[in-house]
């Protein structure tokens, strides 16, 4: 059995209880493909069906938001790499209650991703092996990836490297194939192209800009996970360099994997194709190109994407709750690590909740699981909002301390304020839209409850912390 090591017993170094086990290629591939999830391959069909070709606008706006948020997060992470990422920065710059709240909300978001991705993987596997129940597949996939996360961070990195590589190959192959078809390189396949689609199916904005707004709210959540690289980089040998590289590359990553590939889909599949939502945008595009075994190909790619997301969900949730425990904002047992510097209690606790919610999905009333999902529905926007507010305050702290700012947010503070206003507007719009209102209410209830717990925890367990000027202060 591995010897358990308390974080406090390790040398006094940044993240000393976690080892820099991620190699450069691990972090690089994670940063490249971390943004590619099952939502791109399947969920994009809903956005296209709702907004038509103007779904490109929705993805462009959402992608721009993510680029700006990642720039702000990159500024803070380069200045102070930390496994807790934005939760730690909120703790230091806004207040302990803020770090507590957003850390636990983020953890909750990812432990709910575990059953979602496990169920999606199980559905694909059950279609291939119908004799085995889906809940068995769901638990088996979760168990397998939990085991890989228990050994070492390098195991997580290696699995994620190959998952990411396969996703990148699949997207690039699709883009190349689609581009060849659009320019007439596949003479036996008729592809109308974007201009013809715009003329034949109601124009670029066939359902009005209200539909684009609805699609925007959907697409914004597709990018959740881009920020994981700032958490993972803290377990690499040169976190500041890795974060800088990942943040600088986010523009072309979103442009290539989302905008270009969605453009290809729209150029091949009419937005009002009745099968677009039913089978997914990428499968429908391959079917229209008469690619043999289109469903099998897409199912394999989606299975890889789902496994990748599940793997990252286990890793990310465990690291966030580990960071909370180190700061005294979670049970102290969750900051224990073994000799491989893996926070096994944090991994097991996060996965246990994931297992529980998977069981709830199969055996509890449907309304229970629906409410659980709704409670995390607006967490992505809250995370982005906290990152923006923390960056506003942390920049002032860094300047006051005299610490050089090696990586800067553009047009500070104007772009930061623009992001804050945009997020507040998006939350307000969600509140008045019937299809999103329940998500805002459920997330708001959970947030208020967590804030109260955070304030109570700070009062009951005061701790000493260091601000960026190096002074000791009561928080």
Curated annotation (Swiss-Prot):
The chain crosses the membrane at residues 27-47, 48-68, 105-125, 127-147, 163-183, 211-231, 250-270, 296-316, 345-365, 368-388, 413-433, 438-458. It comes from the Bacteria. Induction: Activated by BauR. It is found in: Membrane. GO terms for biological process: beta-alanine biosynthetic process. Keywords: Amino-acid transport, Membrane, Transmembrane, Transmembrane helix, Transport. It is a multi-pass membrane protein. Disruption phenotype: Cells lacking this gene grow normally on putrescine, cadaverine, and GABA, but growth on beta-alanine is completely abolished. GO terms for cellular component: membrane. GO terms for molecular function: gamma-aminobutyric acid transmembrane transporter activity. Involved in the degradation of beta-alanine. Belongs to the amino acid-polyamine-organocation (APC) superfamily. Amino acid transporter (AAT) (TC 2.A.3.1) family. This is Probable GABA permease.
């Amino acid at each position: 059995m591995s010897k358990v090591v308390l974080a406090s017993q390790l040398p006094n170094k940044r993240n000393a209880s976690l080892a820099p086990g991620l190699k450069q290629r691990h972090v690089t591939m994670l940063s490249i493909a971390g943004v590619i999830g099952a939502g791109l391959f399947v969920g994009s069909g809903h956005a296209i069906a709702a907004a038509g070709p103007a779904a490109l606008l929705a993805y462009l706006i959402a992608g721009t938001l993510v680029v700006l948020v990642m720039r702000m997060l990159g500024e803070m992470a380069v200045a102070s790499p930390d496994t807790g990422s934005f939760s730690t920065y909120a703790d230091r710059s806004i207040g302990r209650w803020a770090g507590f709240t957003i850390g636990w909300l983020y953890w909750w978001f990812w432990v709910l991703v575990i059953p979602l991705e496990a169920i999606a993987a199980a559905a694909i596997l059950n279609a291939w092996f119908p004799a085995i129940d889906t809940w068995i597949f769901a638990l088996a996939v979760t168990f397998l990836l939990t085991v890989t996360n228990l050994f070492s961070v390098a195991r997580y990195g290696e699995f994620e490297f190959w998952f990411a590589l396969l996703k990148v190959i699949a997207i690039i192959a699709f883009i190349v194939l689609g581009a060849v078809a659009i320019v007439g390189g596949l003479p036996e396949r008729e592809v109308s192209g974007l201009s013809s689609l715009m003329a034949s199916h109601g124009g670029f904005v066939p359902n009005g800009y209200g539909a684009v707004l609805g699609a925007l709210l959907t697409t914004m959540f597709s990018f959740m996970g881009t920020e994981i690289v700032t958490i993972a980089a803290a377990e690499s040998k040169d976190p500041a360099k890795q974060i800088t590289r990942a943040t600088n590359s986010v523009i072309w990553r979103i442009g290539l994997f989302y905008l270009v590939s969605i453009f290809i889909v729209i150029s091949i599949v009419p937005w009002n194709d009745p099968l677009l939502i039913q089978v997914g945008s990428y499968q429908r595009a391959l079917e229209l190109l008469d690619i043999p075994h289109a469903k099998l190909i897409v199912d394999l790619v989606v299975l890889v994407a789902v496994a990748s997301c599940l793997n990252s969900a286990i890793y990310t949730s465990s690291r966030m709750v580990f960071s909370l425990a180190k700061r005294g904002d979670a049970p102290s047992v969750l900051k224990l690590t073994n000799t491989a510097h893996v926070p096994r209690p944090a991994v097991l606790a996060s996965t246990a909740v994931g297992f529980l919610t998977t069981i709830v999905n199969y055996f509890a009333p449907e309304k229970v699981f629906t409410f659980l999902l709704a409670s995390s529905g607006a967490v992505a926007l809250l995370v982005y909002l906290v990152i923006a507010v923390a960056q506003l305050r942390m920049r002032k702290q860094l300047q006051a301390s005299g610490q050089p700012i090696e990586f800067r947010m553009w047009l500070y503070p104007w772009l930061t304020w623009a992001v804050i206003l945009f997020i507040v507007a998006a939350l307000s719009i969600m509140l008045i839209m019937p299809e999103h209102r329940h998500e805002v209410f459920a997330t708001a209830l959970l947030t208020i409850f967590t804030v109260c717990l955070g304030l109570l925890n700070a009062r009951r367990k005061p701790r000493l912390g260091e601000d960026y000027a190096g002074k000791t202060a009561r928080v």
